[in-house]
Amino acid sequence: MSRVPVDDHLMDEVGGLHAGALLTAIDAVGGYLAGIVAQPDGIVTTSLTLRMGRRRHVGPLLCEATVLRKGRASVVVLVSVTDEGSGGAAVASSIMTCGVLARESPDPTIGRGVHHPMAPPHQDPVSLVDFFGIQPGSGLITRLEIGDYLRNTWGILHGGAIALLSDLAAVRAVRSDTDTDMAQGDLSATDMVVHYLAPARVGPVEGRCTVMGARPDGTVVRVAVHDAGVDDRMVALASVTVCPL
């Protein structure tokens, strides 16, 4: 279980937490639970899904994780998200799959019942774009520079960072697409599916978008994420639905 603040610098154009930011939190809380049940082995996220029901949030958001399945090779976790500031209203549902990695020298046991109080708001917070090293721009390609603080214990880019890159890249792509009527007005990502294919280690990492077309509830964008510093290898593939207000 984890609480996520809904501060101004974390919000999208519609008035809710960025879908990519929410997936970052989900990756953390779900991954922590998966890490507990996979001990003494380690885990790495292989896929994340998000279905957003309520798009405007008061906060804090409560993320509650439940193990759906623990196997030898993977752990599947359900994360349910509610808005404590809106009387516990349902916000989103996510399913994540983590691959189990054998450790040559197991880390110390991960404790259960750990409590970390939510930190108070920063007086001068850094925007999501700046914190995650996402370069300004528009069009079908969005770039992220990997900072050391964005790496996990395996030395690779956090899955949440790739989710946020996919979110912002998809919104930029829809806004710049001349075949849609959503160039103006508020947009946000609502539904996301992210499959992690290989580790991103060097960077820069690019989200390369293809606008697949419109459906009644929004525009679907495919985001291919590549590590330009390692033979332009594809490291993730995402499908993102971008919706107007």
Model-predicted segments: where are they?
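Short, basic and Ser/Thr-rich N-terminal targeting/leader segments
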Residues: V44-T46, K70, V75, D130, ...
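Generic, ordered loop/turn and secondary-structure boundary motif
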Residues: M11-D12, G53, H57, V129-F132, ...
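HotDog/MaoC-like acyl-thioester-processing domains
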Residues: Q39, R54-P121, Y196-E206, M212-L245
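Generic secondary-structure boundary/loop-capping signal
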Residues: R3, D7-D8, T45-S47, G88, ...
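Generic structural detector for well-ordered beta-strands
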Residues: R3-P5, H9, R51, T97-G99, ...
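Hydrophobic beta-strand-centered segment that forms part of the acyl-chain substrate-binding groove
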Residues: V14-L17, G30-L62, V67, V171-E206, ...
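Hot-dog-fold acyl-thioester-processing enzymes
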Residues: R3-G31, E145-A173
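Non-catalytic linker/capping segments at the edges of enzyme domains
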Residues: M1-R3, L101-Y149
